[in-house]
Amino acid sequence: MPELPEVETTLRGIAPHIEGKTVEAVVLRQLKLRWQINPDLGEILSGRQVLSCGRRAKYLLIRFQTGVLLIHLGMSGSLRIFTPSDGRIGRPDRHDHVDIVFSDGTVMRYRDPRKFGAILWYEGIEEHHPLLEKLGPEPLSEAFCADYLYARLKAQKRAVKLALMDNAVVVGVGNIYANESLFRAGISPHRPANRLKKKECALLVETVKAVLQRAIETGGSTLRDFVDSDGKSGYFQQEYTVYGRHNQPCPRCGGLVVKETLGQRGTFYCPNCQK
């Protein structure tokens, strides 16, 4: 599943190509994603200019004068940009569900083999959208700090990994990056969240930010379907310390990495290094 670094990588790839441009047409080949796409999306967007592009949690936000298009990549989605300088635009296959065509010939194509993503038009205040209004702070923002995390966790008895993956606590820290951050902080994923000391919260905040920033720099992780807007794979998976490394040596102590299930998600950690 594309997580925050993959979505941020996508944002940085598409924004320079579509900001300031006017939509000419929308080609809808498949309406049934996680939620059905508005069949009138072409009529709604045609003639509108993209003012800016942004991201909130794992949602891409394409902003227009009187509304915003929310795009979620789901389990297997990606956005690809084709420009006039590319020559012939790639022929769509059965997983290429939506093309947004701009007046200069640029095409933004949404691909989603598993169809768990979403493309939603909203004309209200962006922050009040039901999918956005209850989200926690961005992990790379100043709002996500030791004081904040310590205050949020001190009343929570659940495992710290589950708390870290809760979008009401902090957005965008998915399974891969929660595993990696907890290892680098030396904190067991099973530790009750309210048992973390203030200095441990500070260290965890620091490692979350470092892991996510490094993942963005390397184009995110490509495990199955994710590619960036140029069709290229990310390579942060080459730097995994524990994720996907069950029964392999811990890079820190040489002991074996363990895989368990926590909250129905694969959880990788080193019992020796993480307490």
UniProtKB/Swiss-Prot annotation:
**Binding-site positions, DNA:** 95, 114
**A GO MF label:** 8-oxo-7,8-dihydroguanine DNA N-glycosylase activity
Sorted alphabetically, which InterPro entries does this protein's record hold? DNA_glyclase/AP_lyase_DNA-bd, DNA_glyclase_Znf_dom_DNA_BS, Formamido-pyr_DNA_Glyclase, FPG_cat, MutM-like_N-ter, Ribosomal_uS13-like_H2TH, Znf_DNA_glyclase/AP_lyase, Znf_FPG/IleRS
How the cofactor is bound: the record states: Binds 1 zinc ion per subunit.
Question: Which PROSITE patterns does the record associate with it?
Answer: FPG_CAT, ZF_FPG_1, ZF_FPG_2
Q: Describe, by residue range, where the zinc fingers (FPG-type) fall in the chain.
A: 241-275
Sorted alphabetically, the keyword list is: DNA damage, DNA repair, DNA-binding, Glycosidase, Hydrolase, Lyase, Metal-binding, Multifunctional enzyme, Zinc, Zinc-finger
Q: Give the UniProt record's GO annotations in the biological process aspect.
A: base-excision repair
Checking SMART domains in the record gives: Fapy_DNA_glyco (SM00898), H2TH (SM01232)
E.C. numbers: 3.2.2.23, 4.2.99.18
Give the highest taxon in the source lineage. Answer: Bacteria
Where do the TM regions start and end? none
- Known catalysed reaction(s)? Hydrolysis of DNA containing ring-opened 7-methylguanine residues, releasing 2,6-diamino-4-hydroxy-5-(N-methyl)formamidopyrimidine; 2'-deoxyribonucleotide-(2'-deoxyribose 5'-phosphate)-2'-deoxyribonucleotide-DNA = a 3'-end 2'-deoxyribonucleotide-(2,3-dehydro-2,3-deoxyribose 5'-phosphate)-DNA + a 5'-end 5'-phospho-2'-deoxyribonucleoside-DNA + H(+)
The cofactor(s) it depends on are: Zn(2+)
The active site annotation covers: 2-3, 58, 265
UniProt function note:
Involved in base excision repair of DNA damaged by oxidation or by mutagenic agents. Acts as a DNA glycosylase that recognizes and removes damaged bases. Has a preference for oxidized purines, such as 7,8-dihydro-8-oxoguanine (8-oxoG). Has AP (apurinic/apyrimidinic) lyase activity and introduces nicks in the DNA strand. Cleaves the DNA backbone by beta-delta elimination to generate a single-strand break at the site of the removed base with both 3'- and 5'-phosphates.
The similarity annotation says: Belongs to the FPG family.
Per UniProt, subunit arrangement is: Monomer.
Please identify the protein, giving its name as recorded: Formamidopyrimidine-DNA glycosylase
The source organism is: Neisseria meningitidis serogroup B (strain ATCC BAA-335 / MC58)
Q: Which gene encodes it?
A: mutM
